[in-house]
Amino acid sequence: MPHLTPLHYGKFWKFLEYVGCRFERQRGSHLIYTRSDLARPIVFPAKKQLSRTVILSNLKTLNISKEKYLEIMQKIK
């Protein structure tokens, strides 16, 4: 099974759009996405590589398992 690895922010951006999030705003280098059923926004820095911690934190907010995330990433590559 593939591992959760650091990821370029552009690929994570595509993932968020795939799961129904929309770009709300940007504050400095941080991109902020929202979805109507989420209690809080998805926030991540526009850095070359997002750490596993940032990805896992946002998956928790989205209520998406690591396995489901990896499955979706295989589809949108």
Q: Which residue stretches match the model-derived regions?
A:
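Basic nucleic-acid-binding interfaces
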Residues: 1-30, 34-77
